[in-house]
Protein backbone atom coordinates (compact mmCIF):
# COMPACT_ATOMS: atom_id res chain seq x y z
CA UNK A 1 0.00 0.00 0.00
CA UNK A 2 2.83 2.38 0.78
CA UNK A 3 4.47 1.90 -2.62
CA UNK A 4 1.59 3.72 -4.32
CA UNK A 5 1.24 1.33 -7.26
CA UNK A 6 -2.44 2.13 -7.66
CA UNK A 7 -4.73 4.97 -8.66
CA UNK A 8 -7.18 4.33 -5.87
CA UNK A 9 -7.91 1.73 -3.25
CA UNK A 10 -10.99 1.00 -1.17
CA UNK A 11 -10.44 -1.02 1.98
CA UNK A 12 -12.73 -1.97 4.84
CA UNK A 13 -12.39 0.50 7.70
CA UNK A 14 -12.97 -2.32 10.19
CA UNK A 15 -9.96 -4.19 8.81
CA UNK A 16 -7.73 -1.13 8.97
CA UNK A 17 -8.82 -0.52 12.55
CA UNK A 18 -8.06 -4.13 13.52
CA UNK A 19 -4.58 -3.69 12.05
CA UNK A 20 -4.07 -0.47 14.02
CA UNK A 21 -4.04 1.58 10.82
CA UNK A 22 -7.07 3.77 11.50
CA UNK A 23 -5.03 6.93 10.85
CA UNK A 24 -4.89 5.88 7.18
CA UNK A 25 -8.66 6.07 6.77
CA UNK A 26 -9.33 9.07 4.54
CA UNK A 27 -13.11 8.79 4.29
CA UNK A 28 -16.01 6.44 4.75
CA UNK A 29 -18.42 5.44 2.00
CA UNK A 30 -22.01 5.85 3.12
CA UNK A 31 -24.68 3.29 2.37
CA UNK A 32 -26.45 6.04 0.41
CA UNK A 33 -23.55 6.07 -2.06
CA UNK A 34 -22.77 2.35 -2.10
CA UNK A 35 -25.49 -0.14 -1.21
CA UNK A 36 -23.89 -3.32 0.15
CA UNK A 37 -24.68 -6.89 -0.75
CA UNK A 38 -27.42 -8.53 1.32
CA UNK A 39 -26.39 -9.53 4.82
CA UNK A 40 -23.18 -7.54 4.97
CA UNK A 41 -22.04 -6.86 8.52
CA UNK A 42 -24.36 -9.35 10.17
CA UNK A 43 -23.02 -12.26 12.16
CA UNK A 44 -24.79 -15.60 11.95
CA UNK A 45 -24.15 -18.63 14.10
CA UNK A 46 -25.13 -22.11 13.03
CA UNK A 47 -25.69 -24.78 15.66
CA UNK A 48 -26.51 -28.45 15.74
CA UNK A 49 -30.21 -29.29 15.61
CA UNK A 50 -31.46 -29.92 19.12
CA UNK A 51 -28.44 -28.35 20.83
CA UNK A 52 -30.46 -26.41 23.38
CA UNK A 53 -27.46 -25.71 25.60
CA UNK A 54 -25.58 -23.88 22.83
CA UNK A 55 -28.74 -22.05 21.76
CA UNK A 56 -29.20 -20.80 25.31
CA UNK A 57 -25.60 -19.58 25.46
CA UNK A 58 -25.80 -17.62 22.21
CA UNK A 59 -29.37 -16.32 22.56
CA UNK A 60 -28.18 -13.03 24.09
CA UNK A 61 -26.69 -11.88 20.76
CA UNK A 62 -29.93 -12.38 18.80
CA UNK A 63 -31.58 -9.11 17.84
CA UNK A 64 -35.10 -9.53 16.49
CA UNK A 65 -35.04 -6.16 14.68
CA UNK A 66 -31.83 -7.06 12.85
CA UNK A 67 -33.21 -10.52 12.08
CA UNK A 68 -36.23 -8.88 10.42
CA UNK A 69 -33.94 -6.72 8.30
CA UNK A 70 -31.97 -9.77 7.19
CA UNK A 71 -35.22 -11.53 6.30
CA UNK A 72 -36.09 -8.60 4.01
CA UNK A 73 -32.62 -8.64 2.46
CA UNK A 74 -32.67 -12.39 1.85
CA UNK A 75 -36.16 -12.25 0.34
CA UNK A 76 -34.95 -9.55 -2.07
CA UNK A 77 -31.90 -11.59 -3.01
CA UNK A 78 -33.95 -14.73 -3.59
CA UNK A 79 -36.47 -12.86 -5.75
CA UNK A 80 -33.78 -11.39 -8.03
CA UNK A 81 -31.86 -14.67 -8.14
CA UNK A 82 -28.90 -12.97 -6.54
CA UNK A 83 -25.49 -14.51 -6.23
CA UNK A 84 -21.95 -13.16 -6.38
CA UNK A 85 -22.33 -12.46 -10.12
CA UNK A 86 -25.51 -10.39 -9.91
CA UNK A 87 -24.93 -6.64 -9.50
CA UNK A 88 -27.66 -6.10 -6.93
CA UNK A 89 -27.68 -4.97 -3.35
CA UNK A 90 -30.00 -4.14 -0.51
CA UNK A 91 -29.57 -2.45 2.83
CA UNK A 92 -32.34 -2.68 5.42
CA UNK A 93 -32.26 -1.00 8.81
CA UNK A 94 -34.68 -0.97 11.74
CA UNK A 95 -36.11 2.48 12.37
CA UNK A 96 -38.83 3.49 14.84
CA UNK A 97 -40.55 0.11 14.85
CA UNK A 98 -40.39 -0.52 11.12
CA UNK A 99 -37.84 -1.35 8.43
CA UNK A 100 -36.36 1.10 5.95
CA UNK A 101 -34.74 -0.57 2.96
CA UNK A 102 -32.96 0.65 -0.15
CA UNK A 103 -32.01 -1.65 -3.00
CA UNK A 104 -30.61 -1.57 -6.51
CA UNK A 105 -30.06 -3.68 -9.60
CA UNK A 106 -27.34 -2.47 -11.95
CA UNK A 107 -25.73 -3.49 -15.18
CA UNK A 108 -22.27 -5.06 -14.93
CA UNK A 109 -20.71 -2.11 -16.78
CA UNK A 110 -22.36 0.38 -14.41
CA UNK A 111 -24.15 2.26 -17.20
CA UNK A 112 -27.63 1.37 -15.94
CA UNK A 113 -28.86 1.34 -12.38
CA UNK A 114 -32.31 1.01 -10.91
CA UNK A 115 -32.69 2.04 -7.29
CA UNK A 116 -35.67 2.19 -4.95
CA UNK A 117 -36.42 2.51 -1.28
CA UNK A 118 -39.36 1.23 0.69
CA UNK A 119 -40.56 1.13 4.30
CA UNK A 120 -42.52 -1.64 5.94
CA UNK A 121 -43.47 -3.25 9.20
CA UNK A 122 -41.01 -5.67 10.77
CA UNK A 123 -43.59 -8.46 10.70
CA UNK A 124 -43.82 -7.98 6.90
CA UNK A 125 -40.06 -8.12 6.33
CA UNK A 126 -40.09 -10.83 3.66
CA UNK A 127 -42.84 -9.11 1.72
CA UNK A 128 -40.89 -5.83 1.89
CA UNK A 129 -37.85 -7.46 0.28
CA UNK A 130 -39.98 -9.15 -2.37
CA UNK A 131 -41.80 -5.88 -3.15
CA UNK A 132 -38.53 -4.04 -3.64
CA UNK A 133 -37.30 -6.76 -5.98
CA UNK A 134 -40.55 -6.76 -7.96
CA UNK A 135 -40.47 -2.97 -8.34
CA UNK A 136 -36.85 -2.96 -9.53
CA UNK A 137 -37.51 -5.81 -11.95
CA UNK A 138 -40.46 -3.86 -13.39
CA UNK A 139 -38.39 -0.66 -13.59
CA UNK A 140 -35.89 -2.33 -15.94
CA UNK A 141 -33.78 -4.45 -13.66
CA UNK A 142 -35.51 -7.55 -14.99
CA UNK A 143 -33.96 -6.98 -18.41
CA UNK A 144 -30.50 -6.78 -16.81
CA UNK A 145 -31.13 -10.00 -14.90
CA UNK A 146 -32.27 -11.75 -18.09
CA UNK A 147 -29.10 -10.66 -19.90
CA UNK A 148 -26.96 -12.02 -17.08
CA UNK A 149 -28.64 -15.42 -17.30
CA UNK A 150 -27.85 -15.84 -21.02
Q: Where do the protein language model's features map onto the residues?
A:
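Small-molecule-sensing regulatory modules
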Residues: 2-150
Amino acid sequence: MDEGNYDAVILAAAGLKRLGLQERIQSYISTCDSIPAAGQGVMAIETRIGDDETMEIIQFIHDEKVASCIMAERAFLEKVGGDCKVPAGIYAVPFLGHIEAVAFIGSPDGKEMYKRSLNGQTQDAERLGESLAEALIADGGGRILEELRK
